[in-house]
Structure formats: C-alpha cells, structure tokens
Design a protein with these regions (language model features):
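Nucleotide and nucleotide-moiety/phosphate-recognizing core
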Residues: 1-110, 120-134, 141-147, 154, ...
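Hydrophobic alpha-helical segments within soluble ligand-binding/sensing domains
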Residues: 114-118
Length: 192
C-alpha cells in the first residue's frame, strides 16, 4: 500500500435524529452503508464531524459525517482533509440530488455545486471544484411551488428508500473504482 494513498469519503447530511431518513440525509445513509460493509466504525469526533478509518482494497480510507449541518459541510471536510494531507481529488463526497429520480446515481470527477449548498460549502473551503462526488437521486419536488426545504427535509416514502438502499452495492463498487483511479469506468457502469 502506498503511504500517500489515502482517501476521505464524506457523506453529507444534518446531524440531529429528527433528520434521520430525510431526503437531504441520503449522503449520511450511504456513508453508513459503506462503513457497515467495510467494517469501519464512524464514532470518533474531530473537526466537527464523526469519523473512522480503515483500509479498503489497499487504500487507506477516512470516512466522515460532518456534524456542521449541510450548509457548512466544508467546515468539517476541509480541516479533516488538511489534517490527513489528503488532496482535493482524493475527497469523495456522497450527497443527495433532487434532479435525479430516487436511487439514480450520478458520478462526476468535479463540477459546480449545482444549487447544492453542502457542495458549495466544500468548494469554498477546499478552494475549487476538483473533487469527485457521487450524487444520489432523491427525486424532484412534486410541483414547482412546493417548498424546497420542506421537500429535502421530508422523509422518504418506503418505495423511494428501497430504491436508494438497493443501489448501495453499486455505490460501494463505484467508490472502490474511483479510489482505484477508474472513475470513468465507475461512470459507465453505475451512472443511472
């Protein structure tokens, strides 16, 4: 294992129990699924986040759930990346995406925040857009006048929650490919 081969995988969400199972916490739930699959305990606290570390396919991995609330996610992610000397292109972010149907994955090597305040905070704190992300479809608002905050902070109906959890094996495989330097392959296999 290369000593410099370390990845930070951050799942975005809001920390209070009342947000468990909400659309905006799809990133937290996905990170929990990875932690469970990889047998990494995410229970230590540092830089306003819950974190744990382990090894996956020969890569050192730090898993992080920022406890800053969504809109300040970068305030936890940037210091954690700095502490472990992890470059931005080795920071993989898992977050919700209202432009995609529930369970659809959108893997990107970089890009704008696309209206996502958690991504905006990370871009601001890391100083650029050059970090990979897996966006998890949570479904669009039922109509344009529906309040966005009410939608993303609402709970998933069971069928949408299942559509997302059914994709966790694909998300895990995609994360491994990304760490292996095969993001393009992850996109072709798992986008959609």
């Amino acid at each position: 294992m290369n000593e410099n081969d370390i990845w930070l995988i951050a799942g975005l969400g809001n920390p209070e129990a009342k947000y468990d199972g909400t659309r905006h916490n799809a990133g937290f739930a996905a990170l929990d699924a990875l932690a469970d699959k990889w047998n990494i305990s995410v229970g230590k606290t540092k830089f306003q986040g819950l974190w744990g570390q382990g090894e996956v396919n020969g890569h050192k991995v730090v898993l992080l759930k920022p406890l800053t609330y969504m809109n300040l996610s970068g305030d936890s992610i940037a210091p954690m990346a700095g502490f472990f000397k992890i470059p931005a292109d080795h920071v993989l972010v898992l977050c919700d995406d209202i432009t995609q149907t529930p369970g659809k994955l959108r893997i990107r090597p970089s890009g704008s925040a696309g209206g996502h305040n958690g991504l905006k905070s990370i871009i601001d704190r890391l100083g650029g857009e050059n970090f990979p992300r897996i966006r998890i479809g949570i479904g669009a608002k039922p109509h344009p006048d529906y309040d966005l905050a009410a939608w993303v902070l609402g709970k998933f109906p069971p069928e949408d929650a299942k559509a997302i959890s059914d994709r966790y094996p694909d998300l895990e495989a995609a994360a491994k490919l990304i760490m292996d330097g095969k993001l393009g392959l992850a996109q072709s296999k798992y986008n959609g």
